[in-house]
């Protein structure tokens, strides 16, 4: 036994009567494994000299009455000193003012079991038979009151293999040092002040709330620790359960309780128990890894220390050792996982406040402990920030223990004022999430999963907030931001956020709208550039066309110059040469000699049959001359190649265009009025049909 823990109450009993779902069950040498019924009971005042624990127990061989405890403050209701619980122990509103450990145990006589349950430094410790004792701890002191919630599992083997468990909660009003305030179960606090000095002088007696995150008016929620035990399993056989954290819905067979809003909710789940610790805590320090090994509440059996590591890069808390342990059915941590949805409202009178509760199923004895500090506000309805400053993360986190204790936590959502702190397990930027809730996630793997690296703090869709406009007052919590801040990268503390409303949804959407505008401007600029490129291409095409036109014009000009030079030299020009100057000239020249221009028919589009019919209709139309007229008017001579002049002329004369034969020596040639020469017989036949030059289309022979 740890000498710091002091004596423990030991009782014995071989017979118990347990009540499960209204039926009495006779059990010999077995621990209490029943569904606890909530009752309103205050804490007894058993003051003893300083430094010694006080024991108050109630033993009975009949069905036992189990109570629910809640610490609170109120000045309008009678204190617990005027109340007597159902088992006859009168409670007092006075709390010890020294370091005395008060243990209230409910059990059977004649049994020897390990004491565990709920213990407050200088406060109350629930005995071995108290299970399913959710405590609603409310602080009323204006001074900061660091809290350290330790959830541990104790698996002791005694007469009936009684398995007990519980929750250890420490309140230290004398200081805020994390290293000195985190104590093992049963260790005495070393603070000079009273552990309960900051608490109110009275306790409210109210029904158990359906959700641990429901807070009463005038109270400051800081820690909600709930352990539940189910009696749906009939046997006490142990089974191996992997320590996993997953999500499930509450069992339908669970009894219902009514919260202070009048809303009925399920309190228990089927198959095992669950442990929940809820609080709205924040962190003012960014650490890469939080690893901690706890201490077993009753160190009767040595166990292996297993350290969990929470990193900003991962999504789960992974142990360094094995977590496979055999867990009895009556262990309060054996239960299907359950997560309850949460809704946020700004007011405490009209809205329903729920929170996301993470239940830890099938957790073994090797459960680690996260310690945090809490600061209570003086008689205020709003929760104050719970910080984990850098200077408080001392060697206490690095010192391995022989046992592991770990609370499961869910945040309180009754946020009526902006919270100034951030909760960060890992280093990062505080602006990674805005207007969000702490939603721990779970998975079916063997490792205990922690919140995802970059969670979105969004209320569940099935429970929308009653006043969404006030949700912006929530602090921008950031669990695992992916963006590292310069101070966090150097190991320094993360600066606190300023007070005031946080960024609204409109401001959050501003970067996306600016991005869209930048994209639109980029598209607009790209369109303008494309238009300019098209214009440049068009200009290039026009330039090429102009260059081609210029080349054509230059060619035409050169041809005209050649024709002019030929005319100046007196050379014979053809009709094509005149067409160079103007195409209309050639058209006028052809029309000039067409006497029957008005009588012309469009023979180009006429078929062969139409042309034959036209010839028969018109008849033979002859414009030629007779042979006698031709012989008289046409000049005739013989072609000779012997004379130099004839040789030179012969070289320049083209062949006969009618018969396409070259002129030979001694051929009779005929010369027309225009000067063109042909064979005499060829041109005579041509002029007899048509009095036109076959080359220039001018009048061949002049008639009298």
Swiss-Prot record:
Q: Does the keyword tRNA processing apply?
A: no
Q: Which UniProt keywords apply?
A: Flowering, Metal-binding, Transferase, Ubl conjugation pathway, Zinc, Zinc-finger
GO biological process terms, alphabetically, are: flower development; proteasome-mediated ubiquitin-dependent protein catabolic process; protein ubiquitination; vegetative to reproductive phase transition of meristem
* Broadest EC class assigned to this enzyme: transferase
What are the start-end ranges of the zinc fingers (RING-type)?
656-697
Compositionally biased residues, Polar residues: 43-61, 281-290, 300-329, 340-354
The record's annotation in InterPro entries points to:
MBR1/2-like (IPR045191), Znf_RING (IPR001841), Znf_RING/FYVE/PHD (IPR013083)
Any single GO molecular-function term of the entry would be: ubiquitin protein ligase activity
- Extract the ranges annotated as region (Disordered): 1-20, 37-61, 176-197, 245-354, 381-403, 436-525
Under PANTHER family, the record lists: E3 UBIQUITIN-PROTEIN LIGASE MBR1-RELATED, E3 UBIQUITIN-PROTEIN LIGASE RNF165
Q: What is this protein called?
A: E3 ubiquitin-protein ligase MBR1
């Amino acid at each position: 036994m740890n000498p710091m823990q002091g004596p423990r109450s030991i009782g014995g009993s071989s017979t118990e009567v347990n009540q499960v779902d209204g039926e009495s069950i006779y059990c010999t040498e077995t621990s209490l494994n029943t569904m606890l019924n909530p009752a309103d009971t205050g804490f007894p005042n058993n003051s003893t000299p300083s430094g010694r624990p006080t024991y108050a127990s109630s033993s009975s061989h009949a069905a036992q009455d189990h109570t629910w405890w809640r610490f609170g403050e109120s000045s309008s209701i009678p204190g617990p000193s005027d109340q007597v619980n159902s088992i006859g122990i009168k409670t007092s509103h006075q709390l010890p003012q020294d370091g005395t450990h008060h243990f209230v145990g409910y059990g059977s006589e004649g049994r020897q079991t390990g004491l565990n349950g709920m213990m407050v430094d200088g406060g109350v410790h629930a005995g071995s038979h108290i299970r399913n004792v959710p405590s609603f701890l409310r602080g009323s002191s204006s001074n900061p009151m660091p809290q350290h919630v330790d959830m541990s599992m104790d698996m002791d083997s005694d007469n009936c293999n009684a398995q007990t468990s519980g929750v250890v909660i420490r309140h230290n009003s004398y200081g805020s040092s994390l290293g000195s305030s985190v104590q093992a179960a049963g260790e005495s606090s070393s603070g000079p002040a009273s552990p309960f000095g900051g608490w109110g002088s009275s306790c409210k007696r109210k029904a158990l709330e359906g959700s641990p995150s429901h807070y009463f008016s005038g109270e400051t929620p800081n820690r909600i620790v709930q352990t539940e035990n189910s009696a749906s399993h009939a046997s006490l056989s142990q089974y191996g359960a992997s320590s996993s954290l997953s999500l499930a819905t509450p069992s339908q067979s669970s009894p219902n309780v009514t919260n202070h809003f009048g809303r009925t909710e399920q309190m228990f789940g089927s198959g095992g128990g669950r442990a929940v610790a809820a609080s709205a805590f924040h962190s003012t320090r960014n650490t890469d890894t939080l690893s901690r090994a706890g201490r077993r509440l009753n160190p009767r059996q040595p166990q292996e220390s297993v350290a969990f590591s929470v990193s900003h890069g991962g999504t789960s808390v992974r142990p360094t050792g094995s977590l496979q342990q055999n867990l009895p059915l009556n262990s309060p941590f054996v239960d299907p996982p359950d997560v309850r949805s949460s809704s946020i409202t700004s007011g405490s009178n009209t809205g329903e406040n729920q929170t996301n509760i993470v239940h830890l199923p099938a957790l073994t004895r090797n459960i680690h402990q996260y310690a945090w500090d809490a600061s209570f506000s003086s008689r205020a309805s709003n929760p104050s920030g719970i910080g984990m400053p850098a200077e408080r993360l001392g060697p206490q986190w690095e010192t391995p223990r022989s046992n592991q204790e770990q609370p499961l936590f869910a945040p309180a959502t009754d946020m009526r004022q902006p919270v100034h702190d951030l909760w960060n397990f890992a280093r990062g930027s505080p602006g990674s999430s805005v207007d969000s809730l702490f939603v721990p996630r779970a998975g079916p793997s063997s490792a205990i999963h922690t919140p995802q690296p970059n969670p979105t703090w969004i209320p569940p869709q099935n429970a929308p907030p009653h006043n969404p406009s006030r949700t912006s007052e929530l602090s921008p919590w950031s669990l695992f931001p992916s963006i590292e801040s310069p101070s966090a990268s150097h190991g320094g503390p993360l600066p606190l956020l300023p007070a005031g409303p946080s960024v609204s949804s409109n401001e959050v959407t501003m970067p996306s709208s600016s991005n869209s505008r930048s994209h639109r401007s980029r598209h607009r600029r790209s369109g303008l550039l494309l238009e300019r490129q098209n214009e440049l291409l068009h200009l290039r095409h026009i330039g090429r066309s102009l260059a081609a036109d210029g080349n054509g014009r230059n060619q035409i000009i050169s041809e005209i110059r050649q024709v002019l030079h030929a005319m100046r030299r007196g050379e014979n020009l053809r009709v094509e040469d005149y067409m160079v100057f103007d195409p209309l000239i050639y058209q006028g020249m052809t029309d000039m000699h067409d006497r029957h221009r008005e009588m012309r028919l469009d023979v180009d589009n006429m078929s062969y049959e139409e042309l034959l019919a036209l010839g028969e209709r018109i008849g033979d139309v002859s414009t030629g001359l007779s042979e006698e007229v031709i012989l008289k008017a046409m000049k005739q001579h013989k072609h000779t190649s012997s004379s130099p002049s004839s040789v030179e002329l012969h070289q320049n004369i083209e062949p006969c265009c009618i018969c396409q034969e070259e002129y030979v020596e001694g051929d009779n040639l005929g010369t027309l009025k225009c000067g063109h020469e042909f064979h005499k017989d060829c041109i005579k036949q041509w002029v007899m049909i048509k009095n036109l030059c076959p080359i220039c289309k001018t009048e061949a022979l002049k008639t009298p």
